[in-house]
Amino acid sequence: MTENILNSPGGMRSYLDSIAFQLEEIQDRIKGVFRQWAYRPIITPTLEYYESLTTGIGEKYKKQMYKFIDYEGNILALRPEMTAPIARTVANKIDELCLPQRLSYRAPVFRYEEPQTGKNREIYQIGVELIGEKSPGADAEVIMLAVESLKSSGLTDFQIDIGHAGFLNGVIEELKVTDSQGEQIKRWLNKKDMVSIRDFTSRVEIKNINKLLGIVRLRGKKEVLQRAKRLINNDKSKKALKDLELVYEYLCDYGVDNYVNFDLTLIRGFEYYTGIVFEAFTENLGYTICGGGRYDSLIYQYCGKEIPAIGFAIGIERVRLGLLNQGQELETPEIDVMVVFSYQARKPALEAIKKYRKQGLNVLQIEKEEVDQEFIKKHLKTGVKKIISFCEYSSNQKIKVIDDRGNIELLTPGGDLP
């Protein structure tokens, strides 16, 4: 028992100083973009009823949920993602809301990932949901916002893959396979696993094997959509391709098409997606930094009303790793002025501190009887730009000013402090 006193549970992280500051800074930049796009904040409980959180998310994420039983015998769980809690909240207030709603959040989510994956079990996310609007323009707006959000974080080298749940659903229906076979084929297509597809089609009679193998290669720029049209012959997939073409027009008009690829085998882990889906990647990271899509049936499962919606979530820790991989210098907490003072000199020191803070400077105050060279060197290494010492003020009426190179200047009070 005692060995756990100093440790966090597996997959949970504690962040101090520079890393914590950087994660906050990334969130603040992205949140600023959300605000510019008129997305308003929403806050939902970290702990909810299990049955509420499992609506539409799929078996994989149900198995990864942290579950509890409260004192009244209810099964509760920590949220594994934010879309279902937001859908429940909107459904609960649907008669009071003016649609469409543009909502934003930043919150931790919890998934019991297997230890060998090396993934965190507490994941810091920031994201948006556009609820109550169904159009190519709405889909494009959310993708454009994802691009601008990632750019605001400082990322320069990233791509967004766009697909459509309806495209693969149409392909599977055309193959006339069972539901379980269809889901397996989707996973193979998504992984570009041609070996498994060939093996499966050698055991099960499927006429359109060449068509299926051709679909595996449907990834690239706009020409992919034209190639796809020649491979499919069902209305559902055709409509999906038309949706993608219209969304792409908006992305071109806004000037973010250079960030976009099409991947028509793309599927997302959550079962509630019904239309456009997308994921963002950056070089040298083996996982997505952002993902989202359209879910037009989820809110119906809560309130019985058809309310279309689309959104995305960004993994803050993954964005930070992406920035480091791109060789970017991440900011560290800055202290503009550190004021050190003895008890006897507290009054003039506190007056100076108040003045600096009114000027918008970050001020660290430390009460200490004397300042030596070791103290100065240690704090200048942490990024302190200037040290002002009142420690000798009571004896010689002098103020010691030390700049970021360690140069010392003695000042007499009366004029303005530097």
Curated annotation (Swiss-Prot):
CDD domains attached to this UniProt entry: HisRS-like_core
GO BP, sorted A to Z: histidyl-tRNA aminoacylation; L-histidine biosynthetic process
Keyword Amino-acid biosynthesis: yes
A GO MF term: histidine-tRNA ligase activity
PROSITE patterns, alphabetized: AA_TRNA_LIGASE_II
Residues annotated as transmembrane: none
Record's keyword terms, sorted: Amino-acid biosynthesis, Cytoplasm, Histidine biosynthesis
Intracellular or extracellular location(s): Cytoplasm
Pfam families according to UniProt: tRNA-synt_His (PF13393)
Keyword Secreted: no
Involved pathway(s): Amino-acid biosynthesis; L-histidine biosynthesis; L-histidine from 5-phospho-alpha-D-ribose 1-diphosphate: step 1/9
Any Gene Ontology CC annotation: cytoplasm
Protein task: Required for the first step of histidine biosynthesis. May allow the feedback regulation of ATP phosphoribosyltransferase activity by histidine.
PANTHER family membership: HISTIDINE--TRNA LIGASE, MITOCHONDRIAL-RELATED (PTHR43707:SF1), HISTIDYL-TRNA SYNTHETASE (PTHR43707)
UniProt family annotation: Belongs to the class-II aminoacyl-tRNA synthetase family. HisZ subfamily.
SUBUNIT field: Heteromultimer composed of HisG and HisZ subunits.
Additional remarks: This function is generally fulfilled by the C-terminal part of HisG, which is missing in some bacteria such as this one.
Protein name: ATP phosphoribosyltransferase regulatory subunit
UniProt organism field: Halothermothrix orenii (strain H 168 / OCM 544 / DSM 9562)
Gene behind this protein: hisZ
